[in-house]
């Protein structure tokens, strides 16, 4: 892609009054296959502003990554097809942009850290070339300027001897170091929005903590927004401002991190919270799994998609799709009984204990 000198960088444009940096409104992405229609993303909505972190949580196949890939314009169509909704960045619809416009958006305005850095990095090119590629495309840097900035970026993300490492290949880096390279690549053009698709899945807990801390440090320094995709609620516990819980392509609960952990209203969210390992070793409580398997996205029944696995499901749940119950703060959950105080007494004890202890500490 040649740098288009007539292209107006959207990052230089103010967010229209009354709008958000990123607005996803009832997004639906379906895949049309020989076996049927896969409803991979079915009605996702959220907003994101500068400096905010959104955690997107759910099991494999819940639509987390497909939502992100749709925003980035990386879904092949066909078989993919946007069946409804919109994605607006700084007031402009991404879905209506041409491919040339999207090439300017990717990496420059919205960047993505992919799940597996070993398959995301090109094994035949040196690290310095790959980190500096975006700078040459979007900023018009020369080869020497891009290499110099790539060296600075590797140093920024904590890779030792960056002057030497820019001339090495991906196979010469450990898993944690490769993930740092991916972060350096994503941050090269100082994007407005950084999408991190399970960036810590294959890493041990020590490196995992370092990567999360690094992302938070970069956010504090640059003020960018982060979308953190993960299957583990514990990963986003300390870094997310807002959390969206997805199941079978649909958002089942959305709220602030405090609301999700302390005031959750959906049984699937409760299951995710109960599956987080406890820190207190002396209690020796067994983990509580979510029984059953996620449904096929081609054969979703008419009722609540979680009802076959939900221990509280009723006939109403099995026959009627629940509407979102929204509180004044904007916290919503897609459950028939999320407004019932008696039903909410089934919420995890750990969640209520945390909430009670927090209140006690504030008193």
Features from the language model and the residues they span:
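Charged, flexible cofactor/metal-binding loops and thiol motifs
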Residues: 14-18, 257-359
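ABC ATPase NBD Q-loop/coupling interface
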Residues: 32, 86-104, 142, 213, ...
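P-loop NTP-binding/switch modules centered on Walker-like glycine-rich loops
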Residues: 59, 195-199, 203-285
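Conserved ABC ATPase "signature" region
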Residues: 90-93, 144-164
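ABC ATPase NBD coupling module
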Residues: 94-111, 137, 259-264, 295-301
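A short, proline-enriched helix->beta-strand linker immediately N-terminal to the Walker B motif
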Residues: 188-192
């Amino acid at each position: 892609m040649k740098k288009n000198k007539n292209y107006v960088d959207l990052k230089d444009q103010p967010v229209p009054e009354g709008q958000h940096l990123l607005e996803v409104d009832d997004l639906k992405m379906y895949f049309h296959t020989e076996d049927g229609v896969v409803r991979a993303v079915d009605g996702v909505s959220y907003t994101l502003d500068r400096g905010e972190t959104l955690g997107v949580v759910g099991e494999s196949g819940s639509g987390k990554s497909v939502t992100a890939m749709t925003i980035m314009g990386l879904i092949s169509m066909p078989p993919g097809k946007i069946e409804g909704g919109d994605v607006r960045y700084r007031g402009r619809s991404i879905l209506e942009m041409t491919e040339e416009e999207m090439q300017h958006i990717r990496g420059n305005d919205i960047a993505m850290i992919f799940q597996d850095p070993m398959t995301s990095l090109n094994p035949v090119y040196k690290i310095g070339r790959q980190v500096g590629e975006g700078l040459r495309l979007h900023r018009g840097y020369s080869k020497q300027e891009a290499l110099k900035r790539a060296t600075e970026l590797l140093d920024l993300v904590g890779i030792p001897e960056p002057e030497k490492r820019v001339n090495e290949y991906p196979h010469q880096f450990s898993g944690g170091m490769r993930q740092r390279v991916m972060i350096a690549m994503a941050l090269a053009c100082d994007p407005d929005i950084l999408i991190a698709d399970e960036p810590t899945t294959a890493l041990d807990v020590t490196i995992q903590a370092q990567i999360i801390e690094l992302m938070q440090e970069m956010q504090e320094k640059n003020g960018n927004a982060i979308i953190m995709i993960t299957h583990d609620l514990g990963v986003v516990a300390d870094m997310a401002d807002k959390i969206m819980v997805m199941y079978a392509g649909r958002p089942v609960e959305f709220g602030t991190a405090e609301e999700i952990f302390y005031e959750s209203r959906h049984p699937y969210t409760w299951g995710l919270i109960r599956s987080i390992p406890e820190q207190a070793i002396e209690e020796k409580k067994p983990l509580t799994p979510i029984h059953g398997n996620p449904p096929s996205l081609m054969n979703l029944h008419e009722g609540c998609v979680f009802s076959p696995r939900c221990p509280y499901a009723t006939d109403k749940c099995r026959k009627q799709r629940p509407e979102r119950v929204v509180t004044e703060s904007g916290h919503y959950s897609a459950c028939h009984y999320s407004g019932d105080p008696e039903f909410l007494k089934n919420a995890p004890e750990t969640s209520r204990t945390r909430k009670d202890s927090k209140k006690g500490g504030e008193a």
